[in-house]
């Protein structure tokens, strides 16, 4: 019948491979109806929460299917299994008819993303600090030193709101009074019915470590997502109309992991927990977009985490460029050129290596004519050459790892 959701059941025998890491057959994902499935990765970058054996009601392949990127894991049948096969185009209809499935996917994705994001921060940004609401004062101090008074005023206000008797409360009040004459168009709170909001350029929507219970949909303008690490502002993303952000704080009732600042004048729709529950049942397209957004972020962070295990600096740089090409959906067999939207400094932040080490590796890559620096942006004269170099570096790393393992076994045998 037209309009009726039709899902197919598929069976796999014990030990059969269902999906294979790196493959691009990602149109479908699976929900386990009967049996058990083992999930594994070629490089186990971090221990998975919840283990790697899945059973009835669990799902897999959603990250790659909804992000339309290559598989980041291999799924193999532990027993004979019966699976429900869902095409990505059916997801909106599925969640419209089955709200619990939507919530399970979104909540699991949110927890997974936060877990992976914290692991990546430890490895690349070298930040391992536990959540601390008093960090709001440090955020305010940073922006005050940069004479960015709108951001500073907001963070001071939020610090006082949540830490009125904190160790730095007196200093925060004093600083707010000093910078108040230079601050306009800064609103630190909104009423329960103020869902459509306007923000002027450079004003803060929320600050890292601030409690949050709303996600935002950008309707006009742009918002940048930043984090203060080692007393520096690290740019994580610039989001534009149609993008969604702030979802993890809403879904998990945990502090914001980064700050959101208006990159230009912008208009956003704020969605609180009560509205979000209604949206799942009535706004399936928006929920599907949120799922796709989370899936895309998870895929990208997995790739970045795997990148941290590459020991050769040039190998790590080629790999991160390859990841960026796939993220931007550039065909790997393309002989065309491509200019990345970042330069050497941002590249060093991505791979978590010292700038001097990155510059040295880049010089060698430039000498080999694999890349160029054009207007302070990384430029690949031929995309396929980046892919070839990445594959070559990966093979060399595997050979070296095999040699180390052989030497270790030989020593143990002696």
Which residue stretches match the model-derived regions?
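Regulatory nucleotide-sensing modules
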Residues: 1-42, 179-234
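Cyclic-nucleotide recognition modules
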Residues: 49-106, 237-291, 299
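Amphipathic alpha-helical repeat elements characteristic of tetratricopeptide repeat
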Residues: 85, 130-134, 138, 196, ...
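Structural motif
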Residues: 36, 81-82, 222, 265-267, ...
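Phosphate-/nucleic-acid-contacting segments
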Residues: 132-179, 320, 326-414
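Short alpha-helical segments that sit at the start of domains
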Residues: 304-329
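Short, structured interface segments
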Residues: 94, 99-121, 163-183, 287-295
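TPR-adjacent "capping" and linker segments in tetratricopeptide-repeat scaffold/adaptor proteins
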Residues: 118-135, 188-189
